[in-house]
Amino acid sequence: MACWEKGGQVIESQLESEYLKKPLEYRVYLPPCYAEQPERRYPVLYLIHGQTYRNDHWLNLGAADLVDRLAATGEMAPFLMVFPYDRDHYISPPENGFGEAIVADLIPAIDTEFRTLPERADRAIGGISRGGNWAVHIGLQHPEIFGALGAHSTPIFSSDTNPEIAKWLEAIPLERLPRIFMDAGENDRWLQYTLIFEDLLNTENIPHEWHLYPGYHDDDYWQAHLEEYLRWYASPWRESH
């Protein structure tokens, strides 16, 4: 089909939220053939950028091009990606209402405007560095919404102490635990803080996938592992969709 050769489309938009002082800006990646297959519905992956970056971070790493290629060859089921912008990137929760805005406002807007599969099994959240903090913070507090979360080179928020995260984990029924993927570079300057969360998951006997690779806390590292990330998120999503 010719539409697979054209690649996907990225749309920029914004919405108002009572949880934020300014509009929430976001980008949406629509996979190849989205317009040409109006009967089809898609899983959604929410991806959050690193601190001091903008919501084109994952796109600049090559996320859209990679999904274009893998979906066109049939190696991966196509899916939507949503990239929200954490404008107040030096403020952590609960003072920063970014997480609440995603859950209360952005997800309903995406499910209304686009042809999504609005079930937790077809929705995942992940992030790089600070963005991974948000993925943990949002994903563990809303296991009814997300079936998977990824934390890439992620030191936890100082406000999300071990007892607080442990409470979230203990409150999740076993059948509602999201799939969890974590990774970091051996020379990551924040590695000791990433290991805090990884150690907690081990202490709580929470199933998760953990990788420690050569590399630093930088774009070269994340770009080198981008395909692994996206394949992991999409692994439960089949072409039957």
Q: Which sequence ranges carry the predicted segments?
A:
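Non-catalytic cap/lid and distal C-terminal segments of serine-dependent acyl enzymes
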Residues: 1-241
